[in-house]
Design a protein with these regions (language model features):
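N-terminal secretory signal peptides
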Residues: 1-5
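Sequence/structural signature of beta-propeller domains
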Residues: 6-19, 23-385
């Protein structure tokens, strides 16, 4: 039994005894949905009351369709549809692309198809408020492609969002700006302000500067689309802040959350105050030691969900007090990574992928259960960047 499992089994009492009066003073209930059970038929350890199913397997037709699920499924999102919903998933391969699963109102898969093709290493991305998927190429001159989840309109490259080693993008619907991460050891955090809302063909791309107190300012890039001999975007503003391997990023309730894999951190940027804080850091987490932070999502209840690239192959909920608490663990896949967590519109189903599965072939899953039963924590914010 590892420390995370002990915490889940022991609940609030065990956590308070183990970690002292500070947690006792908070009155936190540090359990999630109870201890993880034995692996199910799909090799997934889930809390009691939850169940999983495999939706798609790399190299095989999906359900009753003729569409073959692609290599290395990665970042994903859910979109409402007139007759159900759609889950889209990137393919982190060369060639890459984006594929989609269409669901009927009862959750059955009724169609599968491509919405973007001919791209390279589509890693993560982000959904827009106007219903498109932004798919990011993780290559040195990577682009962002805007994709139609319905698969009707062709995917369109958006070079105005910069040419660099993209990882993910989050859209702030209030400030009408986009935030982007860069997957390099010296990657940057970027902000894009479109000239016209819902049009990403032109705008201003800026890079973040962070002062000693953790406050963020932004400086425009001189050349957002550098060529092979030009200064790369991350080096155009010498005073910009380097982040150690930018990964998933998401907007929620006026804040941006993003992960950095090189130091296993999750950052929180308050857009109202421009203050950057550390929400989670493996180095200071006394419980879970969440490792390999990657894709980030937010549940319908507002809980932060982080997928592990390696580590224990877990999806982990991160509290505002900086604790990482496991929701599920995939067994028997030590050379894979979890990716693409996203909830259906009802909040009862969670979709995600294992990029390489137990045999090198990717799998896309659904987990269904009483997500709304989660008891809220007494949470606090602390930790300066």
């Amino acid at each position: 039994m590892n420390r995370r499992e002990f915490l889940q089994i022991g609940g609030a009492f065990g956590a308070r005894v183990l970690f002292g009066s500070s947690l006792f003073a908070l009155g936190c209930d540090l359990s999630l949905y109870g201890p993880l059970q034995a692996p199910d038929e799909n090799g997934i350890r889930l809390p009691k009351g939850f169940r999983s199913r495999v939706l798609a397997r790399q190299g095989e037709p999906v359900a009753e369709t003729a569409f073959v699920w692609p290599l290395a499924p990665d970042g994903g999102a859910v979109f409402r549809d007139d007759h159900g919903w759609i889950y889209v998933a990137n393919s982190e391969a060369v060639p890459g692309g984006v594929s989609a699963l269409r669901f009927d109102p009862s959750g059955g898969v009724v169609d599968a198809y491509s919405i973007c093709a001919g791209t390279r290493r589509n890693c993560a991305g982000g959904a827009t408020p106007w219903g498109t998927w932004l798919s990011c190429e993780e290559v040195p001159d990577g682009r962002v492609f805007e994709c139609d989840p319905q698969g009707v309109a062709a995917a369109v490259a958006r070079p105005a969002l910069g040419l660099f080693q993209h990882e993910a993008v989050a859209t702030d619907p209030v400030g009408r700006q986009l935030y982007l991460t860069e997957d390099r050891p010296d990657g940057r955090l970027y902000r894009f302000t479109p000239n016209r809302w819902e049009r990403l063909d032109a705008g201003v791309l800026e890079v973040a500067r962070v002062d000693a107190a953790g406050f963020v300012t932004w400086e425009a890039l001189t050349n957002p689309t550098p060529g092979p001999r030009d200064t790369p975007t991350r080096l155009q503003v010498p005073a910009s802040r380097a982040f150690n391997g930018g990964e998933g990023i998401v907007w929620s309730a006026g804040k941006i959350f993003f992960a950095t894999k090189g130091d296993d951190r999750v950052y929180e940027l308050d857009l109202a105050t421009s203050l950057l804080r550390i929400r989670y850091a493996a180095a200071t987490d006394p419980i879970a030691q969440l490792r390999g932070v990657d894709n980030v999502a937010v549940s319908p209840r507002g809980d932060l969900v982080v997928a592990e690239d390696g580590g224990n192959m877990e999806l982990v909920f991160v509290t505002r007090e900086g604790l990482g608490l496991a929701f599920l663990r995939v067994e028997g896949q030590p050379f894979s990574e979890l990716a693409g967590p996203a909830f259906d519109p009802s909040g009862q189903r969670l979709y995600f992928s294992s990029q390489r599965g137990p045999d090198g072939r990717g799998l896309t899953y659904e987990v269904r259960g009483p997500f709304q039963a989660l008891r809220r924590h007494a949470l606090r914010d602390d930790g300066a960047a």
